[in-house]
Amino acid sequence: MAHANAESHAGSHHYTSTGLDNRKLAIWIFIGSECMLFASLISTYLIYKGKSVVGPFPHEAWTNPQTGQAFPAILDIPVTSISTFVLLMSSLAMVMALAAIESRGKPSGAKSKLGNYLLTSSRFWLFMTCLMGATFLGFQAYEFTSFVHEGLSIRTNLFGSSFFTLTGFHGAHVTAGVIWLGTLLAIDMKRGLQPKDAVWVDIAALYWHFDDVVWIAIFTLVYLIQ
């Protein structure tokens, strides 16, 4: 009887023959497919890079042929660097949120109330992750609006088409991540996420870290390399 209960308990974790939880395997397969998607989008951007006939251009100043008005290079690297830093810090907050849930019910070892709170408050860290993700999206919305105001849209030239498609897809993924983490935050506030729920937070964390890694590639290839 005890043996049967043990088998039932082990089976409830849904492990594959490799010892990996089915839910984690599913997210890794999904991330693999997303890698191929972004690889194709980045490749398309690189193929068309520098082939736009008319401006605006990413790294070169240009003059509007109709008005004669001169414009600087359209990419604002300092502003985007700030948004990139915010997104990277959100990954740290996500790590802290997962650690807080996994250690729930265990002594934190912190000597102060503040230290104990920061080590055990998954709600705080989930909120900070969502906030920083939303801040990144706010920066992206500002950037898109500025580009359109300066004459760059998805139909303007090859750069505009490939840029808006690539960064727009990434922004959509970040939006989905913020909604996902916001849902986990709501659940945590309602009933409290326990160590047994950590796998779901871990899956969300894998997705969030993937979004960050993709953005590092985009930021490097689009903004930094001229």
Roles of regions detected by a PLM:
Residues 1-226:
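...captures the hydrophobic TM-helix bundle architecture rather than a specific catalytic motif
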